[in-house]
Swiss-Prot record:
Belongs to the universal ribosomal protein uS19 family. It comes from Fervidobacterium nodosum (strain ATCC 35602 / DSM 5306 / Rt17-B1). GO terms for molecular function: rRNA binding; structural constituent of ribosome. The keyword Ribosomal protein applies. The keyword Mitochondrion does not apply. GO terms for cellular component: cytoplasm; small ribosomal subunit. This is Small ribosomal subunit protein uS19. PROSITE patterns: RIBOSOMAL_S19. Coiled coil: none annotated. Protein S19 forms a complex with S13 that binds strongly to the 16S ribosomal RNA. One of its GO terms (biological process) is translation.
Amino acid sequence: MSRSSKKGPFVDPKLIKKIRMLNETGEKKIIKTWSRASTIVPEMVGHTIAVYNGMKHIPVYITENMVGHKLGEFSFTRRFGGHTNKSAKKGEVKK
């Protein structure tokens, strides 16, 4: 079930406060955040936000196409090691 439209999108209050301060001053600075659940709003476009993935902060440059998505969608929490070869599964030695 999606969020009620009368509530509006969720954005961490501290994060939106930092974005508004940077918009007023015109500064382009990387903002660290742990709020992966925050929705990207049009005010954030053009800023770089470092989103925590559980291990480190991943810098994400916000574009217009990202508006409406969550910050956590752009900072992956798992590493994909790749699929194993069929020969490795059977225990054969590849020559």
